[in-house]
């Protein structure tokens, strides 16, 4: 991993003056800390962003970084702007099976067995560094409702933007695209003012939660002001 990253940085720096590197949240992976340590050998030419994002919210950070660069911001300024907005995002994930959380050591075998017996559909949350438990649903339908209601609450209370005009809304899923498309219709009905971007969950997340997962995510929009 280390060699791959630095080789790519070296390649990019042959034709570019600076790099903005955005790894996944430091609370979920050691790759962020590793990248930061590696960047110390590049005399400020590589700016590693630790803005606690992952999956579709990290994708939005990459788009934001590109737009900020086109607006005239340098790498250090982009890093600062993205990190200033590190807590202005939310992710809610419904897990369809507990087996992968058990295999990853995130829940005990006993808890997994009990949850499977009760047919629980946990809803997990990321608001910052960690992946945390948010709610337990008995059905997929209930889990969907919990996630939509939680996102509505975030729009209104966390971001003070009930109509969603200043918020990027995203969705993600593992394996079952048909179920994801059906859920997307429900989410779109709940948030008619938002354009929804949907992508598969990254492999680094999928391996911990397994197939059949559904997620809603959002991040507050960043203004791009020319110098």
Predicted regions span which residues?
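Glycine-rich oxoanion-binding loops at beta->alpha junctions
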Residues: 1-12
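Mixed-charge interfacial surface used for oligomerization/domain docking
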Residues: 18-19, 27-47, 53-227
């Amino acid at each position: 991993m280390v060699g791959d990253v630095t080789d790519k940085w070296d390649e990019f720096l042959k034709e570019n003056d600076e790099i903005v590197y955005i790894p996944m949240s430091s609370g979920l992976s050691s790759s962020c800390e590793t990248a930061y340590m590696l960047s110390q050998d590049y005399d400020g030419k590589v700016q590693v962003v630790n803005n606690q994002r992952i999956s579709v919210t990290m994708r939005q950070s990459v788009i934001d970084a590109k737009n900020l660069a086109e607006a005239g911001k340098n790498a250090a300024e982009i890093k600062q702007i993205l990190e200033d907005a590190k807590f202005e995002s939310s992710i809610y994930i419904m897990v369809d099976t507990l087996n992968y959380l058990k295999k990853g050591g995130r829940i005990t075998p006993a808890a997994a067995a009990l949850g499977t017996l009760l047919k629980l559909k946990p809803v997990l949350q990321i608001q910052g560094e960690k992946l945390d438990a948010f709610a337990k649903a008995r059905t997929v339908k209930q889990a969907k409702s919990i996630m939509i209601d939680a996102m509505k609450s975030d729009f209104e209370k966390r971001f003070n933007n009930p109509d969603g005009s200043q918020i990027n809304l995203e969705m993600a899923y593992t394996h079952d695209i048909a179920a994801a498309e059906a859920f997307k219709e429900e989410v779109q009905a709940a948030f008619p003012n938002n354009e929804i971007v949907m992508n598969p969950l990254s492999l680094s997340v999928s391996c911990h939660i397994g197939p059949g997962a559904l997620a809603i995510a959002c991040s507050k929009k960043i203004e791009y002001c020319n110098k």
